């Protein structure tokens, strides 16, 4: 897992680490890469979405970031409710 993503996942406040950032609104966290939401996690419902389908879709770094979030939340027992093709 990327160190920057690991820092975001271990923080309960808004944070920016390099090109990665997070925004918290109530129990929902929005994880962004270059300002675009690539993962949305609801800690209350234990669900997450991977709604990303944007300009960086062919980038290996974007695919890696999306896969890191997916692996992390599935490992925590969260349910994947939406996944866009990357």
Residues of each region from the PLM?
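Terminal leader/tail segments of proteins
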Residues: 1-86
